[in-house]
Amino acid sequence: MAAQLHHALYELLHEAAAAQRALLLAIPFSLLLLPLLLRYLAASASASATKNDGAAPASDPDKLLSLLPSPPMKLPIIGHLHLMGDIPYVSLAALATRYGPDLMLLRLGAVPTVVVSSPRVAEAVLRTYDHVFSSRPRSLVSDIIMYGATDSCFAPYGDHFRKARKLVTVHLLNASKVRSQRPAREEEVRGALDRVRRAAAAREPVDMSELLHSFVNNLVCRAVSGKFSMEEGRNRLFRELTDINAGLLGGFHIQDYFPRLGRIELVRKVACAKTRRVRKRWDDLLDKLIDDHAARMATHQDEDDDKDFIYVLLSLQKEYGLTRDHIKAILIDMFEAGTDTSYMTLEFAMTELIRKPHLMKKLQEEVRRNVPAGQEMVTEDNLPGMTDLKAVIKETLRLHPPVPLLLPHYSLDACEVAGYTIPANTRVVVNAWALGRHSGYWERENEFVPERFLSGDVAGGVDLKPNEFQFLAFGSGRRMCPGVHSASATIEAMLSNLMYRFDWQLPAGMKAEDVDMTEVFGITVSRKEKLLLVPQAA
């Protein structure tokens, strides 16, 4: 977190220089922030003194929060920010073990944040009291990128969220729509396999990170914009912007931790300059696609086309009262969530399997046993009996949840959880990474053991749609990721075919223990190093 803070300050200074503001060029931005922070601290102290004249009422939010378990190493102004580390979900899990195994309070700058680290409390927050914790805290960055948080992921709870959520779950990501995309999935899988086949013939390693990212990105682009997705290199531009979004939405932004700074126009302009430039690029790209679709609809040229997401949104625009900005926000959601979850799960699955060849061999045998002899590739008709395949995917999601810290929740009212009262307007973060490695629920919790999902114990009954809260690959409740059907279909189709068509080895000279498992944190998690594997036709 210290490195992220330094980077954030550097970004602010860089943006100021780009804007050619003489004052900011003359004064280091950190010095500019100091009086603002001191002013903030003085105002907070004054407000606290006024509030504490006489006995504090039982409903006082600060008093209620002070009763929660909390690490003692809180510093002036920054609070517990210095404890977050470069990989926050790992740091938070370690802190929870010492100071709050179920839930704990962190003061992140000026923002009190409750961290949930046990399945029992996760169930209380995401199921029992889901109606209380179903909102989102506001963020300048997500407000800009998502057109005032009018998408379905970052929108605060209310009528617009319910409308956007219904639109996405009923019309875009329902099981029927996912089934209708099967031909596109099979075509994109075939294209990826052809790339691997050529590498195998040349005895060259394959950059699996690039291959899998490209495969999922192309598939999402087709679902969103149909045959327009490949024109003018749009699929590559979508991928570039999606990657930038992930960094921005998961990055450290000082105004999120000191909200009063975010009210200062100068800070808002400088801190969010890059975000506004990225939004402009999204505008240019999405406006062109929407205009193309609208023109075809007006002249009935679309009647024989597959009904991609843009077509569906335009056809429902009046019924749902959607503005153009609403449509663009929902489309960005589809790109962001649809790409990262699937490709990262595929990459982590291949990484874990190459480190345990006996598990890869077992999976290959199952896949090849379930496909008729001579069949070119695995089809979705062959998948139902592949229990090892499903176990590998579940275990990958347990160890490497794509969103290790679920997007923050925000309490709409005061609520008692695990014997503590969480006040209204409190940020709550569920550490999905910690749940998946909770030693009270999992044996050998830090090991890749897919067979745990084949047994008759608790783990064997866990599904991607959570019934037990020790495994939250896609979240839960009103805010559960609606793309579970699409992600499952994409991951199963690709992983099964990689196992069916090829045998895999590490590049010459590498051993399993040489594979770097270092992760990089953003709004989603990724591997630091590319995965290079050598294929051989089976």
Swiss-Prot record:
GO cellular component term, pick one: membrane
Family assignment from sequence similarity: Belongs to the cytochrome P450 family.
Reaction equations catalysed: indole + reduced [NADPH--hemoprotein reductase] + O2 = indolin-2-one + oxidized [NADPH--hemoprotein reductase] + H2O + H(+)
Coiled coil: none
Function: Catalyzes the conversion of indole to indolin-2-one.
UniProt KW keywords: Heme, Iron, Membrane, Metal-binding, Monooxygenase, Oxidoreductase, Transmembrane, Transmembrane helix
Protein residues bound to heme: C481
One Pfam match: p450
Protein name, UniProt field: indole-2-monooxygenase
Names of the cofactor(s): heme
Organism (species): Zea mays
EC number: 1.14.14.153
Pathway linked to the protein: Secondary metabolite biosynthesis; 2,4-dihydroxy-1,4-benzoxazin-3-one biosynthesis; 2,4-dihydroxy-1,4-benzoxazin-3-one from indoleglycerol phosphate: step 2/5
Protein's membrane topology: Single-pass membrane protein
Leading EC class: oxidoreductase
Transmembrane domains' residue ranges: 22-42
InterPro entries: Cyt_P450 (IPR001128), Cyt_P450_CS (IPR017972), Cyt_P450_E_grp-I (IPR002401), Cyt_P450_sf (IPR036396)
Iron found in the keyword field: yes
